[in-house]
């Protein structure tokens, strides 16, 4: 009798287990096949506004960061369940370690009627699936009311006992958006808000070029979890993802991995991925070419973002990766190492480069225009920031009388210093002009032969023509347009060519004809050609003299213009400093 009762109890327990499993399977299949009434309008709005449901349908990205106290198993996998949907992760190799760093992401749809998310951990033994434990997460209490928490620990329980702990992060995504991009934007927003509270953020000027170039901090502060990703400008996306890339990472330099500070920064309108030796170096606004090409432990490394081709993960070690980029048609590689966030960093760099390429392909001209504006602003800041009084914090502590004394002292020093500089520059320019004149006289003497100088002295008509040229140069001096000075030289040569009066004077000049007859080359040219253009071409003396006169006049004009510009700049700097 005892044996039969024992056997009957075994069958009864098996039947109860099978029946309960069957009932659960039927209910689960019914929920998955048959939709809930709240999935359709207007019932979904009725359920929401009457208070039966606490939230609308949305998409949730669950990021599994870390598992603690899972050293009993070699390999596990995770299944995330809701009432209708489930998602299975890849196999995770634990190798019997106490702490595992992961980057498993699960994108799942949360309906209005869903109340709980179940996260189940499984392992395999030969062909058998073994359940490790389960995590139950209340959607309203643990996720929505806490504004989608990040890096929060949850306890995995089986049969009322704690098995392990899992660190999770939750992100609200959109239907037609990339989940990873939404994740980086939300992380960047949290980092930016923390920085704005501490006051360490750097304000970027607004350039009203296009809506995708909006980088105003006030508009950035209006972005939240529910903001449509299409309403965020591309510059704002780049700015937020750059905050995500700001972290410490190991970089391989020659023979070892060295800890450096990674930072994505816009310098003079171009984005660079910087690996800095010291965190304080991120305020620099110049990039040295040697830091792009050379790999040195004691030097910063700067990589242009648009030159990054791909990032390859090492097959032997999942914590190492190689960044392959080009510069001046040559390939370079940089090895990075991270135990916790390697895949997170790789995805952030790839999404950043893709958004930057889209911005350049779609708005190339506007991007160049913005770059020019930033370069002009930086040059103006350098000019305006050379001479400042004291910091605003120091000014508040000073009394008014001392503040006035300091200001007057700096103003007097600036005025005297600027006047001295302007005077010295003006006298230096005068000395240079005199030296240039003397050099021109010497070159003219070397070029002109002794016979040609005698002909110039005896030729009164040519001197009259040179005087007329001087009158023309005086007219050019009164002309304010500098670009027309070069054109007037050609006009003057054309006037000399077309001047019939000069040809008649040369024909009627008996002295010059006697001198030209003695010269066989000049008599043949005058007899065969009555046009003065051929005379000017063949007569090297006249053309050289006229050209030298024009060169001298142009040099004198340029010296006058430079002296005027220097004096004007000195006045402008004085007015700026006084303001």
UniProtKB/Swiss-Prot annotation:
Domain C2: 52-84
Subcellular location: Cytoplasmic vesicle, Secretory vesicle, Rhoptry membrane; Cell membrane; Host cell membrane
Start-end of each Sequence repeat: 442-451, 452-461, 462-471, 472-481, 482-491, 492-501, 502-511, 522-531, 532-541, 542-551, 552-561
Topology of the protein relative to the lipid bilayer: Peripheral membrane protein
One CC-aspect GO term: rhoptry membrane
Keywords: Cell membrane, Cytoplasmic vesicle, Host cell membrane, Host membrane, Membrane, Repeat
Segments of this protein annotated with the region 12 X 10 AA tandem repeat of Q-T-E-I-[K/N]-N-D-[H/N/I][I/N]: 442-561
Observed effect of gene inactivation: Impairs merozoite invasion of host erythrocytes at, or prior to, the formation of the tight junction. Merozoite development and egress following schizont rupture are not affected. Inhibits rhoptry bulb RAP1 processing but not secretion of rhoptry neck proteins RH4 and RON4. Causes defects in rhoptry morphology which are narrower and more elongated. No defect in microneme secretion.
Superkingdom assignment: Eukaryota
Biotech utility: Antibodies against CERLI2 severely reduces parasitemia, suggesting that CERLI2 is a potential vaccine candidate.
Protein's job: Plays an important role in rhoptry physiology and thus is essential for merozoite invasion of host erythrocytes.
Protein name, per record: Rhoptry surface protein CERLI2
Organism: Plasmodium falciparum (isolate 3D7)
């Amino acid at each position: 009798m005892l044996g039969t009762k024992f056997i009957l109890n075994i069958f009864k327990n098996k039947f109860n287990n099978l029946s309960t499993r069957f009932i659960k399977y039927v209910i689960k299949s019914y929920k998955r096949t048959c939709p809930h009434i709240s999935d359709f309008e207007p019932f979904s709005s009725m359920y929401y506004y009457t208070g039966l449901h606490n939230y609308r349908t949305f998409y949730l990205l669950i990021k599994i960061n870390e598992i603690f106290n899972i050293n009993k198993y070699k390999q596990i996998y995770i299944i995330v369940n809701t009432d209708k949907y489930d998602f299975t992760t890849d196999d995770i190799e634990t190798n019997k370690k106490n702490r595992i760093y992961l980057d498993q992401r699960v994108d799942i749809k949360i309906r209005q009627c869903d109340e709980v998310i179940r996260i189940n951990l499984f392992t395999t033994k030969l062909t058998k699936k073994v359940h490790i434990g389960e995590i139950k997460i209340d959607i309203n209490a643990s996720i929505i009311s806490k504004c989608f928490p990040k890096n929060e620990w949850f306890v995995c329980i089986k049969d009322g006992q704690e098995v392990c702990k899992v660190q999770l992060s939750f992100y609200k995504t959109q239907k037609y958006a990339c989940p990873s991009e939404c994740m980086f934007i939300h992380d960047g927003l949290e980092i930016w808000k923390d920085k704005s509270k501490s006051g360490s953020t750097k304000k970027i000027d607004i350039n009203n070029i296009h809506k995708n170039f909006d980088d105003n901090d006030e508009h950035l502060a209006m972005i939240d979890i529910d903001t449509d990703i299409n309403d965020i400008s591309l510059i704002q996306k780049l700015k937020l993802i750059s905050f995500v890339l700001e972290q410490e990472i190991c970089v391989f330099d020659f023979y070892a991995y060295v800890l450096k500070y990674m930072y994505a920064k816009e310098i003079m309108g171009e984005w660079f991925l910087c690996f800095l030796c010291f965190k304080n170096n991120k305020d620099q606004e110049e990039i040295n070419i040697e830091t792009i090409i050379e790999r040195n432990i004691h030097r910063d490394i700067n990589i242009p973002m648009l030159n990054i081709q791909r990032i390859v993960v090492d097959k032997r070690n999942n914590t190492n990766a190689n960044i392959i980029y080009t510069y001046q048609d040559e390939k370079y590689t940089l090895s990075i190492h991270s135990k916790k966030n390697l895949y997170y960093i790789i995805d952030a760099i790839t999404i950043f480069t893709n958004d930057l390429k889209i911005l350049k392909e779609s708005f190339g001209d506007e991007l160049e225009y913005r770059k020019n504006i930033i370069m002009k602003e930086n040059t103006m800041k350098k000019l305006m920031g050379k001479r400042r009084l004291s910091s605003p914090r120091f000014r508040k502590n000073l009394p008014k009388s001392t503040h006035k004394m300091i200001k007057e002292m700096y103003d007097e020093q600036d005025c005297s210093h600027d006047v001295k500089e302007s005077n010295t520059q003006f006298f230096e320019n005068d000395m240079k002009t005199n030296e240039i004149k003397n050099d021109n006289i010497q070159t003219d003497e070397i070029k002109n032969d002794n016979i040609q100088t005698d002909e110039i002295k005896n030729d009164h008509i040519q001197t009259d023509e040179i005087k007329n040229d001087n009158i023309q140069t005086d007219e050019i001096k009164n002309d304010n347009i500098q670009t027309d000075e070069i054109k007037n030289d050609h006009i003057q040569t054309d006037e000399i060519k077309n001047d019939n009066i000069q040809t008649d004077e040369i024909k009627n000049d008996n002295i010059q004809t006697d001198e030209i007859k003695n010269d066989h080359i000049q008599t043949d040219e005058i007899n065969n050609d009555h046009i003065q253009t051929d005379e000017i071409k063949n007569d090297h003396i006249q053309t050289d003299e006229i050209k030298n006169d024009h060169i001298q006049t142009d040099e004198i004009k340029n010296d006058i213009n430079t002296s005027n510009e220097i004096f004007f700049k000195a006045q402008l700097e004085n007015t700026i400093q006084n303001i």
